[in-house]
Amino acid sequence: MYKNAEYLLEKYVEEKDQDKFKILEKIYVPNAKVTFEIDTDTISFPTEILGNKNIAQVLSAEFNRKYDHVQTYYLSRSFPQINDFTISNQGWLVIMREKEDNSIRVGTGLYDWIFEKQVDGNLKISQHNISIGVMLCLPGLPFSFLNELQSKLPYP
């Protein structure tokens, strides 16, 4: 099912953005760990999340209660693979709307991933670091602006 890292990373974006947390939890090993490095005060996450179910809950279910029309994009389709089980400094961009005030959010940062090969040959995520460098809050813009931005980029 998840035989290569590129496919797994596409599934991560789709499941996280579309609030499919039950599927998202399946791409992480049960004892997976997600850590955060956040260089902005316009968004917050816990310092770390332990366990695939907790990860899926925070990154998908809770996140999608606060934001909608979430689309995350990889800034390069060439994943900077260190070896078969590690990808480092994968640039990303997210464009979304905050439900509370309808402000548009645009953020960027880096992902680092460590994968584990399972007995069945599939890869799963064992460690994931999310660095958020910028998270702009753009209040007062029409919803059409969000659609226009998202329509110009290949997803995921």
Q: How would you label these PLM feature ranges?
A:
Residues 1-14, 18, 22, 26, ...:
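Short, low-complexity N-terminal intrinsically disordered segments enriched in polar/charged residues
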Residues 2-10, 98-104, 114-156:
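Terminal "cap-and-tail" regions of soluble proteins that handle hydrophobic small molecules
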Residues 12, 16, 43, 47, ...:
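Conserved aromatic-histidine-acidic binding/catalytic patches
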Residues 30-91:
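A solvent-exposed, acidic/Ser-Thr-rich amphipathic alpha-helical stretch
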Residues 51, 107-109, 154:
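Glycine-centered flexibility motif
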Residues 63-69, 99-106:
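Short, solvent-exposed secondary-structure boundary motifs
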Residues 73-79, 108-117:
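Hydrophobic/aromatic beta-strand elements that line small-molecule binding cavities or substrate pockets
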